[in-house]
């Protein structure tokens, strides 16, 4: 379900059907918490499903119990597969916060629109500069997460290759 629909359902639906008068910020926190949790759960599920069955069987064949198989075999592979999707979800959630302006929450885009409206006649190019600044703010927030993801992915890949080489050198 789209986030905007969820925002409207929680913000307006809670007031009408549950008799609760939620603030825009509270409704946004509720929606982003449930949406982010559901999305992350789906990502974890798909990462776990993507691990081939023979990985589990190999662990059991080595005499490991269920917890050891998950801890030593499945979890490291799942994290490697989950990391890019999780960072993508994080950046999507950051960028989707702009929708909360539609339920009255003051955030970056709403402030930008107010600045543009106030200076429309005195500075006709204000929209370009304000939206450029908003873009730059979102970029400054999201870009470090993407870089961190890249560093972590390389680190996990290097650690994996080192373990494989160490394993191969034993034989």
What are these regions (language model features)?
Residues 1-171:
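Transmembrane alpha-helices and adjacent helix-loop boundaries
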């Amino acid at each position: 379900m789209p986030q905007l629909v969820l925002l409207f359902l929680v913000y307006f639906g809670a007031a009408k059907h549950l008799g609760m008068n939620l603030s825009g910020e509270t409704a946004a926190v509720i929606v982003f918490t449930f949406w982010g949790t559901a999305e992350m759960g789906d990502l974890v599920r798909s990462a776990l499903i993507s691990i081939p069955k023979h990985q589990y069987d190999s662990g059991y064949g080595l005499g490991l119990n269920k917890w050891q198989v998950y801890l030593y075999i499945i979890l490291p592979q799942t994290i490697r597969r989950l990391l890019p999707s999780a960072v993508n979800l994080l950046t999507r959630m950051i960028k989707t916060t702009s929708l909360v302006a539609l339920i009255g929450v003051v955030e970056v885009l709403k402030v930008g629109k107010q600045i543009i409206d106030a200076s429309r006649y005195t500075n006709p190019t204000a929209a370009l500069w304000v939206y450029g600044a908003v873009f730059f703010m979102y970029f400054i927030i999201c870009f470090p997460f993407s870089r961190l993801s890249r560093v972590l992915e390389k680190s996990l890949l290097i650690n994996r290759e080192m373990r494989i080489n160490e394993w191969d050198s034993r034989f």
